[in-house]
Every structure is written in C-alpha cells, then in structure tokens.
C-alpha cells in the first residue's frame, strides 16, 4: 500500500502531522530510515527548533541523501523549519548551509512586532498552486517563528502574510512545497491543504 513518509530526524513535530494525516484517512509512516523515504509516494519534512541544530540532526540521522532525492522526484512538503531547510543557508545562531533545493536564505524577521510571531495570520496567495486549490485568499493559518525565508527567485513565492513586514508564508516549485505556517494546526484550512498535498501523492484514503 502506498503511503506518505514523515521524516523522523529528531527535530520535528512528527506526531501532530501523523495524527492529522490519520484523521484525513491517508496512510502514512514515520520515516527513520532511508528505505521508508525512498519507497514513499510523497514526503513531509517537519521541523522545530534552531536551523543549525536541525541540519546537524538530519546529517546525523543519515537521511540527507534520501531527502534530497525524494525532493527531486515526488511530492515533497517542508513545514515551518522544514520549509526553511529547503533553502541554501540561514544566519540563525550562525551561518549554516541548508539543503539548497531552493535559492535564497533565512534571516530573522525585521519587524517592530513581538517575536516570535505566534498565532493566526492571513494568507495572501500570490501564485495559486495545487496545495492552495479551493482556498479563499485571506484564509487564516497558524504561525510560530522568528525567522523567515528570502527566496532569490520571486517565482518560488506562493503566498505571504503581514507581520509588520511582508513575510513569505508559502513557497512552491514543481513538486516541491513549503509552508512557514503549521497546516496541521491550522483548522479546516490546514486540513484542506494537507488533503490537497495527499491528492498529489495519489495515496488512497
């Protein structure tokens, strides 16, 4: 039976994503080995904490090559820090290389508002894509972050939000997607987006 793999590298909110996919009825597996990732119909890379720690944890897990391969071949979604890891580098704590799947870098949000941004904020969808299908512009989703992406290619920017400055909320390029917000914590809107992602994988309910 086909399934969606949730990458377990020791730095992600695995269970909330797993439970949400279960709720939606999509087969999924916690993936702590490369073969589970390689055999998946789609892959989700969650992430919490600091960028350098997450990249080090991914390296130590031995899953980096499987993740890179999956991101080039099948529907792939990075969530929160997992989205940030898709980019080339971050200056959180210290300059650190990312996965380099998207050009650009991660920097602290320059805003007069309190950091981290915690709570609900509206999406301004700039470039509709498969994951935003059926969503109304201005839909609210749930954020928890202090750093944001600066995509080098504006065409990769799918949606933004306003937090005293324009903050990239979603990126998309081909089969590759990233959500700075947490779809698994974003109510009906988040459920719809994860359903849309699951449809791309063709995993049966």
What are these regions (language model features)?
Residues 1-5:
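Extreme N-terminal starter segment of soluble prokaryotic enzymes
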Residues 17:
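Divalent-cation-assisted or electrostatically stabilized phosphate/pyrophosphate-binding catalytic cores
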Residues 29-39:
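Short acidic low-complexity segments
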């Amino acid at each position: 039976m086909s399934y969606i793999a949730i990458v377990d590298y020791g730095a992600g909110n695995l269970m909330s994503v797993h439970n949400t996919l279960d709720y939606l009825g999509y087969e999924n597996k916690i993936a702590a080995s490369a073969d589970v990732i390689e055999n998946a119909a789609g892959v989700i890379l969650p992430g919490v904490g600091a960028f350098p720690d997450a990249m080090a944890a991914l390296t130590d897990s031995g899953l980096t090559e499987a993740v890179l391969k999956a991101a080039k071949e099948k529907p792939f979604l990075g969530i929160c820090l997992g989205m940030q890891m898709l980019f080339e580098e971050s200056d959180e704590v210290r300059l650190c290389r990312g996965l380099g799947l998207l050009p650009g870098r991660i920097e602290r949000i320059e805003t007069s508002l309190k950091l981290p941004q915690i709570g609900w904020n509206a999406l301004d969808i700039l470039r509709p894509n498969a994951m935003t299908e059926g969503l109304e512009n201005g839909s609210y989703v749930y954020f928890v972050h202090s750093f944001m992406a600066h995509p080098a290619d504006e065409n990769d920017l799918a949606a933004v939000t306003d937090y005293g400055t324009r903050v990239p909320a979603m990126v998309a390029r081909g089969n590759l997607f990233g959500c700075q917000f947490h779809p698994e914590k974003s109510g009906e809107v988040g459920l719809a987006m994860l359903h849309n992602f699951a449809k791309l994988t063709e995993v049966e309910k």
